[in-house]
């Protein structure tokens, strides 16, 4: 028992989120009639404390606890920190949106916290068992959150699609894990790696099938082509506050799962999984960018944009070097912050009975709220990869990692798709600044929301001007 509880302190961020979720659930049940937003405040405090602990742990020793089920290292601490930050932003931006539409606010925060707990377990998983446990704990609350607006038929349809596709993906992943366990008799990722190295020649067909099934499951969670079919429909059909949540932190956790499995469990058959990742990365960047160009509805546009960004993150994984893995980690952390800002504007502007649905709803935003338009301009520039925003460095590091391993042709293709992608981001900027507004009313989002949103967007500029600290943290995470 003492051995099991030794070094349990490294799981403090998860414990804080679990306690917070339970407190938010009970307080919403018993005290909601006295203080409507009590679950919101408890959730925010818990997330901030969890983020602070994760930040303090960065740079500490790597530890394996709970009989090697759970790993504590810089990769997990960085991911947990950014998961907490993006979940906090999602909660803050969504508060007024949920209240106005009289949606069950307590349910949203509690489900969000349990999903966050799943994400944190997922990025610290060192066993196939913990990987699957974390994945399901992350996914199941997301299905319920998508259908949280019970009277909305679009949301119910989106939730059903999400659930059915998610169940198929989970089944494929579980089947892949069962094949690995059947072939090796091991669940710990290092033990799996050793068994694969020894038995690959004799059981290569079985391992190949397992790898394909597992990568298919991971591809679904990332919304990478050809497992992306659910993303545009779910992003469009779900309430904007839920789309905001789905588009940020779960992407970090899903890439964390991919990195754990590929860089530890399947490290000896890197050349085999590179072929699958190559196809997924190329198709994601290509199809994501090309289909985003023709979209007129903003949530669908950002869904295809998300698919293309996942493709770029997979380029880093494809490089199969410590620099490539660090670039992929850096990319997904920054993407989550950018996505929180982009969907944050949609949620914050969807007030007073108005729902931001079409790109045309942003027409003339510069005349209606110049500061908000400037913040969104920073987000669009960062997503397009325009210096001095941080989006430039994310793409630069990923493409440099490809060049370093002599995949220059792939870096050129990635650069070409970046140019195509810039078109639809700049189209939004053009609409905000040069088109006449259809509604002349001033856009007001409240002082608190303006401050938080400004910090979110200005961080993209700050990290672009001073990128060194975060890049160094990502490189050190894989160097160790």
Swiss-Prot record:
Which domain of life does the protein's organism represent?
Bacteria
The cellular location(s) given in this protein's UniProt record come to: Cell inner membrane
Q: What is its main location?
A: membrane
State the membrane topology: Multi-pass membrane protein
Keyword annotations for this protein, in alphabetical order, are: Cell inner membrane, Cell membrane, Membrane, NAD, Quinone, Translocase, Transmembrane, Transmembrane helix, Transport, Ubiquinone
Q: Does the keyword Cell inner membrane apply?
A: yes
Signal peptide (residue range): none
Which EC number(s) does UniProt give? 7.1.1.-
**Which catalysed reactions does the entry list for this protein?**
a quinone + NADH + 5 H(+)(in) = a quinol + NAD(+) + 4 H(+)(out)
Where do transmembrane segments lie in this chain? Answer: 11-31, 38-58, 69-89, 109-129, 163-183, 207-227, 252-272, 276-296, 301-321, 329-349, 373-393, 401-421, 458-478
Per the record, its GO cellular-component terms are: plasma membrane
> What Gene Ontology terms describe what this protein does at the molecular function level?
NADH dehydrogenase (ubiquinone) activity; NADH:ubiquinone reductase (non-electrogenic) activity; quinone binding
An annotated GO BP: ATP synthesis coupled electron transport
UniProt cross-references to InterPro entries, sorted A to Z: NADH-Q_OxRdtase_suN/2, ND/Mrp_TM
Q: Provide the family line.
A: Belongs to the complex I subunit 2 family.
Primary role:
NDH-1 shuttles electrons from NADH, via FMN and iron-sulfur (Fe-S) centers, to quinones in the respiratory chain. The immediate electron acceptor for the enzyme in this species is believed to be ubiquinone. Couples the redox reaction to proton translocation (for every two electrons transferred, four hydrogen ions are translocated across the cytoplasmic membrane), and thus conserves the redox energy in a proton gradient.
Q: What PANTHER family does this protein map onto?
A: NADH DEHYDROGENASE
User: Subunit structure of this entry?
Assistant: NDH-1 is composed of 14 different subunits. Subunits NuoA, H, J, K, L, M, N constitute the membrane sector of the complex.
What is the name of the protein in this document? NADH-quinone oxidoreductase subunit N
**Which species does this protein come from?**
Legionella pneumophila (strain Lens)
Q: Which gene encodes it?
A: nuoN
